Amino acid sequence: MAPQPPKRLLRLLHDALAETPPGRCVWVALSGGLDSSLLLMLAAEASQDSGQVLRALHVNHGLQAAAADFETHCQQLCQRLGVPLTVERVAIESLGEGGVGAARRARYAAFAQHVKPGDALWLGQHQDDQAETLL
């Protein structure tokens, strides 16, 4: 039997889903890493009886050799969970900041394009991640 997430965590996610206005969407920014993949899995479970619309958004910057693998992982995970996935492939033009700043701007532009007023955007971050959580 697979381990079950703590009921308290699922309640918190269910409550957060309930705060999104009816008819609006909860988007999970899905990088394909552990944090966002786990967030999507938990959100999918929490949303099963909520009636809330859940979607995932993957931004493929193409900056890593494994970028295609991350995109494939996102597609397979979303298919398995029954969560619609939007993939944005972006071209990073300026690598003057090591690509990080340009990639962040491209990611934010993708968020702005898809996440509409009243929608929610969830980011999977861990304790040591930068303050992008304050988006």
Pin down the residues of each PLM region.
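Core alpha/beta nucleotide-donor-binding catalytic domains of modification enzymes
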Residues: M1-L135
